[in-house]
Amino acid sequence: MMTMSDFPPTLTSLYQDQVEFQKLLGNTDIPKDDPNEMAHHLLGLVTEVGEVSQADKRWKKNKRNKHYNFQEKLDEIADCFIFLLNVCIYSDITPWQILNAIDRKINENKRRFKSPEKDEEQK
């Protein structure tokens, strides 16, 4: 028999956990649209993206860079998602809104890939 702990967390539960954590840091009036806080977390996201590339240097063109640490890369990608959650929280974007936007954009990208000529005609 499966229990709740057998299922991965949902975006909504992760979002709520991150809101709780931000409140522990003293940001009690959230979620809300706060451009300054959003900008702070965007900068943090850029930093974390750089750390992903440091955890897996196989993307570099020279053959000397073979560094790859799966767990480190996984943790840095998780940090990126956390910063993206914060960007949503400080943009007053709900989990439902972001999931629907992601779904819409994926479908739009698939449509464009399947029919690139139609996309060019619309420009």
Q: Predicted segments — roles?
A:
Residues 1-123:
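Flexible "arm" and connector segments at domain edges
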